[in-house]
Amino acid sequence: MSNTFPALRRFLSSSIAQGLLILLLPFSMATLVVAGADLTRMERIAATRYGPDAAASVRDWRAMLEASIGSDDHVRLARINNFFNRRIRFDEDTRIWQQSDFWATPLETLSRAAGDCEDFAIAKYASLMLIGIPARQLRLIYVRARIGGADSKLSQAHMVVGYFPTPEAEPLILDNLIGEVRPASRRPDL
């Protein structure tokens, strides 16, 4: 956890400072500062509800978000995609939540260290928003993912995050099936 956050929180205690901070800082930093208190609260909730491993996961998530500030968009996309792909194990909702379909919050996904494709996508989408990528550049996209190899005809419903650098641009795809963030045209499996 950053040592600058306690000082920032004290500074942010006045409404004048809050207004100035939001006007003077880039949107991404302002977003993370505002979210900082919520992430601190999430860490406490994770510790209380799910234990110390879950709290550590939230701390690591926060550190990754802080490290992403100031990076270019491609670095931020890759960092967030890799963070969740390495930390979260894919599993079905019926095994994790004993429900046929459950869309978990990032806290729930990190706390269980498991999720299905929607949980990966929601956590990545929320993370990108927390570091200042506007919602107008992001989409949760349902696709059919080809499974079983290159020649397979089998497919299943799947969710990914699409990042649109400009409104007309081809989206870059963040996915739990393939670690590399690629343009949609380089994802023939979807």
Please report, for each region that a protein language model flagged, where it lies by residue.
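A structural boundary/capping signal
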Residues: 2-5, 9, 27-190
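N-terminal Sec-pathway targeting helices
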Residues: 10-15
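Bacterial N-terminal signal peptides
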Residues: 17-30
